[in-house]
């Protein structure tokens, strides 16, 4: 069989940053392989793995084992694991899963063709840099796997924060920004292909530019992206509160294309726990930032994440999170039970909170947030929102998102329309009903 006739399927797990890596790998493979969506049709299967928390690790291993079945039941000849789990546990994966023919770490995304070639030849190919240094640019081939109307733009790679519970700096390397010119050229190309919304992502988006330019460049980057014709929404994800400057607030406020939405992961609401997590700043400072954001941008939607059951977390410290959630009333809040990640400082502590209590606290917080989110959503009933149409349903109904909804992690807007709507178009929708996560409405004629 000629290489050009071989079919490759890429299975992506984890976060949008992983998705971008899969898109770059797919772009490189397009010249030599047919890309297929169904693994059962593929001669080569690539699993781009995640290892952020224990459940993600388990999902990645399960997926590798599931895909390995196609070596017996399907036509798969070569099975390769890439991404964070492969970077962290490459040797162990090769030893424990004999069906694996290759391993590739996070720093070798652009070397996927060489990896496949070696994996097909030798059946034991390990490429996993100790300290990943790779960062893609706009010249690399990339096949977007997201719907045509939006795209993720990775402005930086790696992380220098070293939160005590997190393994990411070890599997993604030091923080490194792309050049502003590279990002702008990529967004211009996306706009020419019909992309309406760009989501700026990194492990720490607010840090963008500091390593490369000696200053935080996110405000100027946003202003330049806003000048690109065709881009209508700019969404900020993964923003650290201590680096969110007054300049950045002003740019958000004065740039209509910036979504009135902010993903601001806080992780906890008690200063002692924050310090033990190696999170910079205090909860009072975070509260001050939130107050300022809501004062300057009254219609902003705020998303955060919290960790329950961090080592040593007392009931009193957990209640600080509960009271903070009640006081701040986030529009979106995701809670995760602490995951004990080996090789992290937090995992070495002897005062681990029992798993049952971690989960109980997580469930309690999410139950509270469900009620808060429902109440927060009611303010949109009767208002007219700009909605990006993304899916057609039967009976003249469509699914879209407002600027308050990031794709895949937030809610949607269900839209009734007497006329046909086009996927990727913006329409004005009068909101008639709201639940905790989704909105319902009718197209404004």
UniProtKB/Swiss-Prot annotation:
Q: Does the keyword S-adenosyl-L-methionine apply?
A: yes
Per the annotation, how and in what number is the cofactor bound?
Answer: Binds 2 [4Fe-4S] clusters. One cluster is coordinated with 3 cysteines and an exchangeable S-adenosyl-L-methionine.
User: So what does this thing catalyse?
Assistant: L-aspartate(89)-[ribosomal protein uS12]-hydrogen + (sulfur carrier)-SH + AH2 + 2 S-adenosyl-L-methionine = 3-methylsulfanyl-L-aspartate(89)-[ribosomal protein uS12]-hydrogen + (sulfur carrier)-H + 5'-deoxyadenosine + L-methionine + A + S-adenosyl-L-homocysteine + 2 H(+)
The record's principal subcellular location, in a coarse class, is cytoplasm
**Matching Gene3D superfamilies, A to Z?**
Methylthiotransferase, N-terminal domain (3.40.50.12160), Nucleic acid-binding proteins (2.40.50.140), tm_1862 like domain (3.80.30.20)
The protein's required cofactor(s) are namely: [4Fe-4S] cluster
Q: Which residues form the TRAM domain?
A: 378-445
Please identify the protein, giving its name as recorded.
Answer: Ribosomal protein uS12 methylthiotransferase RimO
Biological source species = Desulfitobacterium hafniense (strain Y51)
User: Which taxonomic lineage does the organism of this UniProt entry have?
Assistant: Bacteria, Bacillati, Bacillota, Clostridia, Eubacteriales
């Amino acid at each position: 069989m000629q290489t050009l006739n071989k079919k490759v399927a890429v299975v992506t797990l984890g976060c949008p940053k992983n998705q971008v890596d899969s898109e770059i790998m797919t772009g490189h493979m397009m010249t030599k392989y047919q890309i297929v969506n169904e693994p059962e049709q593929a001669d080569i299967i690539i699993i781009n793995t995640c290892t952020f928390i224990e459940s993600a690790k388990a999902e990645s291993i399960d997926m590798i084992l599931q895909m390995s079945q196609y070596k017996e039941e399907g036509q798969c000849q070569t099975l390769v694991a890439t991404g964070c789990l492969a970077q962290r546990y490459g040797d162990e994966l090769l030893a424990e899963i004999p069906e694996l023919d290759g391993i590739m770490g996070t720093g070798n995304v652009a070397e996927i063709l060489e990896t496949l070639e070696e994996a097909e030849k030798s059946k034991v190919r390990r490429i996993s840099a100790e300290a990943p240094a790779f960062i893609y640019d706009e010249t690399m081939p990339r096949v977007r796997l997201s719907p045509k109307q939006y795209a993720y733009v990775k402005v930086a790679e790696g992380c220098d924060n070293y939160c005590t519970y997190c393994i990411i700096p070890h599997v993604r390397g030091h923080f490194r920004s792309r050049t502003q010119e590279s990002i702008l050229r990529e967004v211009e190309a996306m706009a020419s292909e019909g992309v309406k919304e760009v989501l700026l992502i990194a492990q720490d988006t607010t840090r963008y530019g500091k390593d490369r330019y000696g200053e935080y460049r996110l405000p100027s980057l946003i202003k330049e992206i806003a000048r690109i014709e065709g881009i209508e929404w700019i969404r900020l994800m993964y923003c650290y509160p201590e680096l969110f400057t007054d300049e950045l607030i002003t740019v958000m406020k004065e740039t209509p294309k910036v979504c009135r939405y902010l993903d601001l992961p806080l992780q906890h609401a008690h200063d002692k726990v924050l310090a033990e997590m190696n999170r910079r700043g205090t909860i009072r400072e975070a509260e001050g930032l939130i107050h300022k954001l809501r004062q300057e941008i009254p219609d902003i939607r705020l998303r955060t994440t919290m960790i329950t059951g961090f080592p040593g977390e007392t009931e009193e410290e957990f209640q600080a999170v509960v009271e903070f959630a009640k006081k701040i009333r986030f529009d979106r809040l995701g809670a995760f039970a602490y995951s004990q990640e080996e090789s992290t400082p937090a995992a070495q502590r002897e005062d681990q909170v029992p798993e049952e209590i971690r989960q109980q606290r997580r469930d309690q917080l999410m139950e509270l947030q469900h009620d808060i989110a429902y109440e927060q959503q009611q303010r949109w009933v009767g208002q007219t929102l700009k909605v990006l149409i993304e899916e057609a349903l039967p009976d003249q109904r469509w699914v879209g998102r407002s600027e308050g909804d990031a794709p895949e992690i937030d809610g949607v807007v269900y839209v009734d329309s007497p006329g046909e709507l086009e996927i990727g178009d913006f329409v004005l929708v009068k909101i008639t009903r709201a639940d905790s996560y989704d909105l319902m409405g009718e197209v404004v004629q």
